[in-house]
Amino acid sequence: MNVFLSKYVNGVDKKSRVSVPANYRAVLGQELFNGVIAYPSIRNKCIEACGISHIEKLRQMIETLDPYSEERDAFETIIFGEALQLSFDSEGRVMLPQSLMQHAGIEEQACFVGKGVIFEIWQPQNFEKYLNSAQKIAYEKRLTLRNAN
């Protein structure tokens, strides 16, 4: 399966290493790079992570924008300029850079949240707050999915 699913909370050690869930690594294992691309989320106070193939799709979408627009410049700066290639070690861990940890408020634990083609890495309590608001929105907008086809 090529989809990031489920939620996991893993500890972050003193060297800022965290184990990426095994099923996420399996999805990423289909990529050319043995690791993950991580960048600050532009939607939430979390880290977004994906494989090289998704970054390529984002690049193609961003390139459709006016090359001199503020929007394109902002997307390129945040997504590409702030993105980091995080390699897996022999135990399936990555080292989270301090800049990304600070952006997400991550200290001792990281909450991995599957979102289909990407996954997010949250500070666990912040994710629980977000989950409550997301549940309300999903309930209110549930009929939207009926018309998705």
UniProtKB/Swiss-Prot annotation:
GO BP, sorted A to Z: negative regulation of DNA-templated transcription initiation
GO MF assignments: DNA-binding transcription factor activity; transcription cis-regulatory region binding
Domain SpoVT-AbrB, residue spans: 7-54, 83-126
Pfam families: MraZ
Xref: PROSITE patterns: SPOVT_ABRB (PS51740)
Position of the signal peptide: none
Stored InterPro entries: MraZ, MraZ_C, MraZ_dom, MraZ_N, MraZ_sf, SpoVT-AbrB_dom, SpoVT-AbrB_sf
Subcellular location: Cytoplasm, Nucleoid
Keywords: Cytoplasm, DNA-binding, Repeat, Transcription, Transcription regulation
One GO location term (cellular component): nucleoid
Family: Belongs to the MraZ family.
Classification via HAMAP family: MraZ
Subunit architecture: Forms oligomers.
Protein name in the entry: Transcriptional regulator MraZ
